Each structure stands twice: as structure tokens, then as C-alpha cells.
From Swiss-Prot:
It holds the Pfam family Ribosomal_S5_C. This is Small ribosomal subunit protein uS5. The N-terminal domain interacts with the head of the 30S subunit; the C-terminal domain interacts with the body and contacts protein S4. The interaction surface between S4 and S5 is involved in control of translational fidelity. Keywords: Ribonucleoprotein, Ribosomal protein, RNA-binding, rRNA-binding. Belongs to the universal ribosomal protein uS5 family. Transmembrane segments: none annotated. One of its GO terms (cellular component) is small ribosomal subunit. It comes from Halalkalibacterium halodurans (strain ATCC BAA-125 / DSM 18197 / FERM 7344 / JCM 9153 / C-125). With S4 and S12 plays an important role in translational accuracy. The gene is rpsE. Part of the 30S ribosomal subunit. Contacts proteins S4 and S8. GO terms for biological process: translation.
């Protein structure tokens, strides 16, 4: 898999979750923040990243930097995905189903952020298992990563698309 250069893309970013973590010390509590950010060009490229810092803006900046390093390519057919798939990460499972045009993005919270920024216009999704935002985002990205176009599968098998689809 070749790396996608984030500098050549018009990337949008969306903060999915901010977590405040407290460390209790003698003088009281010390707070730190962890941010989960999704970036994408709404044209088949998306990535997510985590950032931790003493302040929220710094955590978000680090997360965006991390997300730009982890961009993936999403195969989009028309306005939807090529086939149904279940993305799994930890206890989080996300079911992604192609939908007919005009359906829109039917997805909750973190999954919706990933699909919107990937540029998927019509899709049905259901999150199963863990509803932790990090696990949901990772499961969604993993599912999108495993998608394959009919042409790619046909080429791998040395057949035509017509032979493959019957």
C-alpha cells in the first residue's frame, strides 16, 4: 500500500472525541486531554489520529498531524461502497452496507464522521458491540480498508468483471 501525501490534498478535519484524564497528585488533580480526530478530502481518502497534551488545542493539533500520517484510500462506486462488510477492532464491530442513491449517510456519531469525510454519500451502517468512539472509528476505517472494487478482484483472479459477476 502506497502512502498518500497529505500536502497535495484539501483535507477537512472533524474532532470526534475529547477525553479528559485526571492524575491525582498531592496538590490536587492534574488534567490532560486526549483528542480523536478524523481527516478526509470527501473524495475517497480518510484517516484518523490520536493526540494527547496538557491543553485541548495542542491535543487536537497532534491528533490532526497523526491522522494525516494514516490516510487510506476508500473505493467508492458512484456514491456508495462496492459491497457489504463488517469492520472489526477489539470489541467494536461496524456493519457497512451499500445503499441506493438518495439514501444518505445513515450512521451514528464517530462512524458518520469517518464516512462523511471519506466522501461516501449513501450508506447504511450499524455499530455492534463496543460503542467506544476510538474502537468504532478504528473498526470503520478497518472495514473501509478491506473493501475491494469488482475490477480489482477480477484482475487478481485473472477474469473479467462479467465472468466474476456471472
Amino acid at each position: 500500500m502506497r502512502r498518500i501525501d497529505p500536502n497535495t490534498l484539501e483535507l477537512e478535519e472533524k474532532v470526534v472525541a475529547i477525553n479528559r484524564v485526571a492524575k491525582v497528585v498531592k496538590g490536587g488533580r492534574r488534567f490532560r486531554f486526549a483528542a480523536l480526530v478524523v481527516v478526509g478530502d470527501k473524495n475517497g481518502r480518510v484517516g484518523f489520529g490520536m493526540g494527547k497534551a496538557q491543553e485541548v488545542p495542542e491535543a487536537i493539533r497532534k491528533a490532526v498531524e497523526d491522522a494525516k500520517k494514516n490516510l487510506i484510500e476508500v473505493p467508492i462506486v458512484g456514491t456508495t461502497i462496492p459491497h457489504e462488510i463488517v469492520g472489526r477492532f477489539g470489541a467494536g464491530r461496524v456493519l457497512l452496507k451499500p445503499a441506493s442513491e438518495g439514501t444518505g449517510v445513515i450512521a451514528g456519531g464517530p462512524v458518520r464522521a469517518v464516512l462523511d469525510l471519506a466522501g461516501v454519500g449513501d450508506i447504511l451502517s450499524k455499530s455492534l458491540g463496543s460503542n467506544n468512539p476510538i474502537n468504532m472509528v478504528r473498526a470503520t476505517v478497518k472495514g473501509l480498508q478491506e473493501l475491494k472494487r469488482a475490477e480489482d478482484v477480477a484482475k487478481l483472479r485473472g477474469k473479467t468483471v462479467e465472468e466474476l459477476l456471472g
